[in-house]
From Swiss-Prot:
Pathway the protein acts in: Protein modification; protein glycosylation
Annotated GO biological process: isoprenoid biosynthetic process; protein O-linked mannosylation
Main location: cytoplasm
Organism per entry: Bos taurus
Protein's name according to its UniProt entry: D-ribitol-5-phosphate cytidylyltransferase
One Pfam assignment: IspD
Family to which this protein belongs: Belongs to the IspD/TarI cytidylyltransferase family. IspD subfamily.
Keywords: Cytoplasm, Nucleotidyltransferase, Transferase
Protein location: Cytoplasm, Cytosol
Length: 445
């Protein structure tokens, strides 16, 4: 068994832990853990998770196994690990990967600072991979470094959007019933064809459900079931709940899951997952400005217009910027009124870099300059273009997407608001699209 980096808890959703959980994430995690202990009588070290990640991704039609396909330049499996890591009461996460991908997986753990991860070699089938993961937690195995949990969660490496409340429901149900799994209503009607490819009969859709992940089991229930499995089950079986029923005689409690439990299976699913992630990290933007009268006025006008495009906009003079970064804001607009330098933007970049905010998600920084075009010489504009390009090249190495925006600053209020509306459209597009091809560009509104 290969061990990932030692240490405490990992990233909170959606960003990295800087000094443990903070704010709403901390409260939510503490609340869930408290409920977990109260409702299920669970010890703090009683839950582990197993992720089979040895698939080849044949249905996706790409050479890279789907769990390692990049979304916003980060492997898909890293998002799934993050979703489990943010749950403080999951103490160990076992990932089963093929021997040829073992070093790749170690690199992912190190680069994205994942914690509580242990690696085992995957089997040739999904069930054999899960069995190998369970063996890493079993007390009867030689050289076992981990404690046997009371409950084990089995999840798919390519379901990145699992939420803590679903995990809590299946674990609590497993403690009471021995086994539990998430289900969803069927989307399409299931039919049975005859031997000559004609309709034989159809199932009444309302009576059936699709089995999803995560699933949870008392460890002894599922481990004993796998120990009794036939080779046929290990080679061709797909449903863990069925193994618990067949070999341990445990009827699983079925828990209604949320719509975001879907599995990345086809190439189009990668695009859908990317859109969801972009949407989640694009809804909060911080507008950084000076306390000068002109700048405050422009900043608050910009705030007013950005709120029509984005859910949460906060304006700050920079004094509480560190706290905003800790609250995991991934979008910053640095306002510069009647100035052509990048000093304020450079200070902001330094703070973002020092915070490690950009380890998991690309951070968008837009340096906005309000200038009277007639009073700024052309040579100064070109100098600005070259300057932001150099800043952007260095920032991109740390996953920060820096762009510049020139907005006309007329004296008339109506014309200023028109300029701001045009600028807001560009800012919103840069934040939502997160197109790395536009870094270092100086756009004009």
């Amino acid at each position: 068994m290969e061990l990932g980096p030692p240490g405490g808890s990992g990233p909170a959703e959606p960003g990295p832990r800087l000094r443990g959980l903070r704010g709403a994430d901390a409260a939510a995690s503490a609340s869930s853990l408290s409920r977990f202990g109260a409702e299920a009588g669970c010890r703090a070290s009683a839950v582990a998770a197993v992720l089979p990640a040895g698939g080849s991704g044949e249905r996706m039609g790409v050479p890279t196994p789907k769990q390692f396909c990049p979304i916003l330049e980060r492997p898909l499996i890293s998002y799934t690990l993050q979703a489990l890591e943010r749950v403080s009461w999951i103490k160990d996460i076992i990932v089963a990967v093929t021997r040829e991908n073992m070093e790749t997986m170690k690199g992912i753990i190190q680069r994205y600072q994942h914690k509580r991860i242990s690696l085992v070699e995957a089997g040739v089938t999904r069930h054999r991979s899960i069995f190998n993961g369970l063996k890493a937690l079993a007390e009867d195995q030689p050289n076992c470094r981990l404690s046997k949990p009371e409950v084990v969660i089995i999840h798919d490496a390519v379901r990145p959007f699992v939420e803590e409340d679903v995990l809590l429901k299946v674990v609590t149900a497993a403690q009471e019933h021995g086994a539990s799994g998430a289900i969803r209503p069927l989307v399409s009607t299931v039919i049975s064809p005859s031997a000559d490819s004609c309709l034989d009969h159809s199932l009444e859709r309302a009576r059936y459900r699709a089995s999803e992940m995560p699933q949870a089991f008392l460890f002894d229930v599922i481990y004993d079931a796998y120990q009794q499995c036939s080779d046929y089950d290990l080679e061709f079986g797909t449903e863990c709940l069925h193994l618990a029923l067949k070999y341990s005689h445990i009827k699983a409690k079925l828990v209604e899951g949320s719509p975001d439990l879907w599995k990345v299976t086809y190439k189009r699913d990668l695009y859908a997952a990317e859109s969801i992630i972009k949407e989640r990290i694009s809804q909060k933007v911080c507008v950084v400005m000076d306390t000068k009268e002109d700048e405050e006025h422009v900043g608050h006008c910009l705030e007013e217009m950005l709120k029509t495009e984005l859910n949460h906009v906060k304006v700050t003079s920079g004094q509480d910027l560190q706290q905003i970064i800790l609250e995991q804001c991934y979008n910053f607009v640095c306002v510069n009124v009647m100035t052509s330098d990048f000093e304020e933007t450079q200070r902001l970049l330094n703070m973002v870099e020092e915070s490690n905010l950009s380890i998991l998600y690309p951070v968008v920084v837009i340096s906005v300059h309000f200038l009277d075009y007639e009073s700024v010489p052309l040579g100064q504009k070109m100098e600005k273009v070259m300057q932001i390009r150099e800043f952007a090249k260095e920032a991109k190495k740390r996953n920060i997407l820096l762009s510049g925006l020139l907005i006309y600053f007329p004296q008339e209020e109506q014309k200023l608001r028109e300029s701001l509306r045009q600028g807001t459209t560009i800012i919103s597009a840069l934040i939502k699209e997160r197109n790395s091809g536009l870094i270092g560009q100086l756009l004009v509104a």
